[in-house]
Structures are given as C-alpha cells and as structure tokens.
Amino acid sequence: MIFSVKAPIPGFESIKEVELEKFDDFFVKFISKSDTTVFTLINPFMIRPYEFEVPEYFRALLDINEKTNILILNIMIIATPIETSTINFIAPLVFNVDNGSVAQVVLDANLYPDFCLMESISKYLNKEKSE
C-alpha cells in the first residue's frame, strides 16, 4: 500500500509518498516513492510497553478517530553488531491504514520521559535473553 506523507518528516522533507514492505512481525521496510530513501522500521509493541496519545493536530491531519485502523512503527538505525542499533521511540510514524496517510509524530519528551530519540536495542535483547 502507498501512503501519502501528510507532514514533512524532519530531515527528509522531500518524501511525499512511501510504501511499506513487511519482513516479519518485528520489521518493516519504509520505501520512499519520491527518492531513494529506505528506512528499517520496527513494531515497538513487540519489544516493550509503548503507549502514547496521538496529539489532536495529528489526529485531525491523518483523519484519525476511535474506529480508525492505525499502525505505529518506529525508525530503527541498523548497526553492526546488531546490539548497537538504535530505535527512535520519541518520534513514531503513525499510519492511517484506512485512508493511506502517514506522519511522523514528535512526542513531547516531558510527557514521555521513557521514550528516547536513540535508544539502544540491546536494552531489549538482553531483557529477552534473561527471561
């Protein structure tokens, strides 16, 4: 499915349309249809508790209501070794699957102090190993 970018993605303002390619329950490839940009996205709910309120501005922009089918994914920077990879939890990508729109929502760090811009995935890999 092609998604229309409704608000510029910081640092990637030229991206107007994107396509998602699912790898598995954890990972999704974010492919720009406007240029050659490709991101690896991760389903945050697979690795940690992750809950936030989509701000009213973005709910209106993406036409989100209580019945809307939404998808939340986070940008992951893949590194070698994998334990040094990072995830951006403070600025999730919110997809309205019903109307094919997306925006990156930069959350208020004061309201969500547990969400970081570059959180190491090792924090979650080690947790899974110890359980």
Stretches found by the model and what they are:
Residues 56-66:
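Short active-site loop/helix that positions an aromatic residue
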Residues 52:
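Residues that recognize and position ribonucleotide moieties
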Residues 1-49, 67-131:
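Long, compositionally biased stretches
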